[in-house]
Amino acid sequence: MAKVYIENVRDLVEKAGEIREKLALATRRIGNVHIGGPMSATDVTTAIYYKYMGFDPDNLDDPNRDRFILSKGHNGILLFTIFCDMGMYDWDLLLDTYNTIGHPFGAHPNHKRVKGIEVSTGSLGHGLSWCCGIGHANRGRGIKSRIWTLLGDGEMEEGSNWEAILYAASHNLDNIVAVVDFNHASAAYETNQNERWGEKGGPEGMADCFRAFGWNATVIDGTVMKEIDKTLAALPEVTLNGKPNAIICSTTKGQGVGFMMERPCAWHIGGFDDDKLAEAEKDIKEYTAKKLAEV
């Protein structure tokens, strides 16, 4: 397998569209899958994996590699889809065996079964703690690679996250990048005006919380690839003695599929019939074309 690298923003937009189409097909073939979150996190995850991580399927044990921890582990189908797209796994194997006994692809990612998965996740609020441990170990070895983690806005209510956020800042772990997919909905309720995010609420309120804990924090439109690309490119150089970085991506659960975005909580998990699949595919093609026109 050759290392996949996409430089051009327009090509990243097209790749994100391809990933969304595959996620829609997976939702039809599998029948019941966490789908709202993967759709909203597709753009930033595509940019990280195909451009900024230097992800190399042939060198997954390189001690100097960047690492990606999917803290919101119920979005594992997104990483599995990317791995299949990169040629690491057979696409039909994923669709035919997903979440079945004895096969690698579970509803939550298992690092013992799926190469490319750094940490088994699913129980929320653990990704940042893993980042702290790996960040410390890398600093001790003088390794200046980044440790990325993708979190959900609902997940950010877990107290363990804020313990890790405080720890990372107080220990100057600037090799950590926390990316929050703020898609404004958990499995049960909207998260935008959560009182935990201060008077502002929403992504800006959450960013203020990160800053109060000693982090650099940036809020971006997580649906605009050009903005994602600019933000990731501007991350400070890792010194192993600076502030960790948080990127709060404002998105909508089910991003790119109209009927999902209209009822985001209802599409935390679900499945498509043939009609829904056709509608989703049409929406994704139109959405991708619109985003390409904006580049």
Task: Please provide the spans of the model-predicted regions.
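N-terminal hydrophobic or amphipathic helices/low-complexity stretches enriched
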Residues: 1-19, 23
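N-terminal capping segment at the start of a domain
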Residues: 15-32, 181
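Cofactor-binding active-site loop characterized by glycine-rich and histidine/acidic residues
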Residues: 26, 38-170
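Structural motif
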Residues: 31-39
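Short secondary-structure boundary/capping segments
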Residues: 86, 193-195, 261-265
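Thiamine diphosphate
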Residues: 116, 120-239
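Glycine/aspartate-rich loop-and-adjacent alpha/beta segment that forms the canonical ThDP
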Residues: 209, 225-295
